[in-house]
Amino acid sequence: MKFDYLQAKLFLLFFLISFSVFAQTQDLLALASGEHLYFNALFDQDENLYGYVSVYGYGKSGDKTRKFEYVILDKNLNPVAHKEFEGDITASLYAGYIDFNKKLILFPKPDHTAVRSKEFFYPRSMEIDLSTNTIKPKTYYEYENNSFIEVTEPKNVRDARKENKAEKREKGYNYVSEVYEIEEGGYIVFEYNDYGKYTNNQNLMRFDEDKNMLWSFKYNEDGDKKNSEFMRVFEHDKNYIYTILRKKNNKDFSFYLQVIDMNTGTVTATRPLTGFSDETLEAITFVYTDSYRSLDNDKTFDDKIVMVGKNYNSMFTSDGFVRMIVDKKTFDVSFRTLHYQDLKPYLPKITANGYLEKGYKLELRDFFFLEDGSVGILMEKYKAQGSYSAPKTTDLVYVFTDKDFNLSGVKVFEKEKTKWAVNADYLFSQYLNDGKDVVFFYRDLQKDDETKEKNWNLFINTLIDGKFNQEQIQISEKDNYLIIPYVGKEGYILLREFNKKDKYNKIRLERLNY
């Protein structure tokens, strides 16, 4: 699991639609008396739905605090716990996630207007013990001078910047440390000296639960502008830490898979990564899209780690995708590529760089890593914003590959043109049947052929045993009412309908036909 994986899962997409079918409901405004601030789904470490959390605000309660309340619902929408708490005044709202300790973490969204700019500090996360329904500020640590320092008060941003500038003047660099609590027990700490244009004196350390050092792994000790090493962790388990090591020698780069023993800190395996551009290997562990979305691009199985990235032929253009598999027994690495031009039998006008007709290009929306070894790639036809034109999206395109990453088919889901809200139509996905199959959801605003009226439609697309089935829920207009879809328990979707003016904010589970 990546260290930032859970946070990368915090905020779900939403869209504006209206709905006319009645179902089992829960009134969010009746669950607490405060102002409703946020609602989101909660997932466990296996990405299974745990339930939902709804957050409410009561305004300023002190010079540096605000009063909030949380309500936890199970996946059947039954309220199971609630409590009022004091949060930092610079928190505007909280979203929730379940960490590997099975604690519910409330992660804040900063409010930069709550205090004067020179007094602003980043709000702290809150930690809820689900077994006792108790809440406290989440404990964070800094590491400096060979010891852990508990962060009890958030540091003023302006003062922190002054300290950094003073340290840079004195030493010529800033000392940086990052502390992560890990599921395998204890802590992982990164430390290094940051000179601005380069770093050196890198150290990766592991500590036990009592903060005793178990091992230290030093690298890039003498790094400078011309020669340096950089290591990115992309996975870890009870046995190993998996990293991509990049070495720079003047203007030349080389890349390696470097596996470090979790228990001893020694290098277990090093495998050169070759045959691809520097840009491809640099970005193999993460994927960003032109419409400003990051995607989860890997999945860990019992015997392997699979990831798919863009295959770059220059700094700014890619000609398709590259799949990398790490064998967890031998640590051997294998690559396979899929090029945009391989899609020509299905998309005749596609270019080598993924462009289509009228300036549209294929923009990534999701990856699906199935148990049989195949990978599905979901994309949307996207046109970037011009000087005098809005960004636009149209059809969704699903690319099938087999276990060897060979193209096995393409399916196009025709969709009306959307302007501006280019991240709003594709919603989310869920694995089905223990990862063998998948379902994904998108919306579309369509005109009725007879009445000529435009209505929102929700499309539920299941891929089971390699075959697609689509269910469509037609939406009726209801002025000024919004509906936000969320992940529901398997076989259901949760719809939240609200209108702030009418003080209407309800959720309901809708049964799906799969």
Describe each region flagged by the PLM.
Residues 1-28:
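Bacterial Sec-dependent N-terminal signal peptides
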Residues 42-153, 176-184, 191, 201:
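Post-signal peptide N-terminal segment of secreted/secretory-pathway proteins
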Residues 47-63, 96, 102-116, 184-197, ...:
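Short beta-strand elements that form the blades of beta-propeller/WD-repeat-like
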Residues 67-75, 120-132, 201-212, 254-266, ...:
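Beta-propeller blade signature
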Residues 85, 272-290, 338-358, 408-429, ...:
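Conserved blade-ending motifs and adjacent loop-strand segments that build the rim/top face
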Residues 309-310, 321, 363-385, 389-394, ...:
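Loop/turn-rich, solvent-exposed surfaces of beta-rich toroidal or solenoidal domains
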